[in-house]
Amino acid sequence: MDNVQLVHQLTCDFEGHAYLIEVFSRPDGSYFARTMFSSQDVIISDGFSFEEALIRHQDLLPLAISSRKMPLSSRLKN
């Protein structure tokens, strides 16, 4: 993640848990939001603007959290 700059952090509460959302800017003027569940489990949402990246991420975060709570047996397998 060279040349990206952290521009904002906020905490989103969902079902009694707090999740950190970090928003970064890129040199080309675009942005992305990131939440790390673990070092190997990260979701990223891209956007042309700060607001677009953050809104997309906030919309997707509940789905990402819920999908991680699904039993492995009910998940699709390749």
Per-region residue spans from a language model:
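Mixed-charge, Lys/Arg-enriched low-complexity segments
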Residues: 1-2, 40-78
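Short N-terminal "domain-start" leader segments
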Residues: 1-27
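A short, structured beta-strand/loop element
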Residues: 19-44
